[in-house]
Amino acid sequence: MKLAILTVLLLGAAVLCLGSKDADHSNSVGESHSSEAFISRQESASFARLKRSYGNNVGQGAAVGSPLESQREVCELNPDCDELADHIGFQEAYRRFYGPV
């Protein structure tokens, strides 16, 4: 028990000593650590390059993987078809609403 109390007191003293070092520093703008958080635009651009795509797929969505996927998306947009798809499956619901494909 005495060892635990002694350990806690020792750690508390260490925290007080280390904490008082930071309190001695001035918080002026020139010495502030927050000024180190900002870098110039040129420096930020040197490591944060964006991938650019020029005109190939502008305005187009991603290609649909399979015909079933496009049918599923059409069925999901119709609330009645979507509800029926929950009960009997989307292929059968799509067939009932939009006919055989």
From Swiss-Prot:
Binding site for Ca(2+) 2: E73, E76
Chief location of this protein within or outside the cell: secreted
Matching PROSITE patterns: GLA_1, GLA_2
Source organism, top-level taxon: Eukaryota
Subcellular location: Secreted
A Gene Ontology BP annotation from the UniProt entry: cellular response to insulin stimulus
InterPro entries: GLA-like_dom_SF, GLA_domain, Osteocalcin, Osteocalcin/MGP
Disulfide bonds: C75-C81
Record bears the keyword Lipid biosynthesis: no
Name of this chain's protein: Osteocalcin
Organism: Xenopus laevis (African clawed frog)
Primary gene name: bglap
